[in-house]
């Protein structure tokens, strides 16, 4: 019997359709599809169109990636191009390594 997969809930805060925003979204989608196929929900929030959401979530810079679930909440601000840094920053690589240890 295989264990249930966790669902990851993420928010990506961007400022408009700038090259940085487009690159961050493209890179993040590639990482998520490779690592978490079908077990994630990603909401993209444009802080220029929805400044109240950025204020509520205390977003000070873009792009910012926030992992909401599973707890604890983690945020990465800035460049998302390094896959390993993104996974470590969100506490996802550690979980992945831990699960591999038990599946030997």
Curated annotation (Swiss-Prot):
List the HAMAP family hit by this protein, alphabetically.
KaiB (MF_01835)
Q: Which family does this protein fall into?
A: Belongs to the KaiB family.
Per the record, what about its domains?
Answer: Has 2 forms, fold switches to a thioredoxin-like fold (KaiB(fs)) when bound to KaiC.
Reply yes or no: does the keyword Transcription apply: no
SUPFAM superfamilies registered for this protein in UniProt: Thioredoxin-like
Keyword annotations of the record: Biological rhythms
| Quaternary structure and interacting proteins, as annotated | The KaiABC complex composition changes during the circadian cycle to control KaiC phosphorylation. Complexes KaiC(6), KaiA(2-4):KaiC(6), KaiB(6):KaiC(6) and KaiC(6):KaiB(6):KaiA(12) are among the most important forms, many form cooperatively. Undergoes a major conformational rearrangment; in the free state forms homotetramers as a dimer of dimers. When bound to the CI domain of KaiC switches to a monomeric thioredoxin-fold (KaiB(fs)). KaiB(fs) binds CikA, leading it to dephosphorylate phospho-RpaA.
InterPro entries annotated for this entry? Circ_KaiB, KaiB-like, KaiB_domain, Thioredoxin-like_sf
Q: Which organism is it from?
A: Trichodesmium erythraeum (strain IMS101)
User: Which CDD domains does the record cross-reference, listed alphabetically?
Assistant: KaiB_like
Protein name in the entry: Circadian clock oscillator protein KaiB
Pfam families the UniProt entry points to = KaiB
């Amino acid at each position: 019997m295989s264990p249930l997969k966790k669902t990851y809930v993420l928010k990506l805060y961007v400022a408009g359709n700038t090259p940085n925003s487009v690159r961050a979204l493209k890179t993040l989608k590639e990482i998520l599809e490779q690592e978490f196929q079908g077990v994630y929900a990603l909401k993209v929030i444009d802080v220029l169109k929805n400044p109240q959401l950025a204020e509520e979530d205390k977003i000070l810079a873009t792009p910012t990636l926030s992992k909401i679930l599973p707890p604890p909440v983690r945020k990465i601000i800035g460049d998302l191009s390094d896959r390993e840094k993104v996974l470590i920053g969100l506490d996802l690589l550690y979980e992945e390594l831990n699960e591999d240890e038990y599946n030997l």
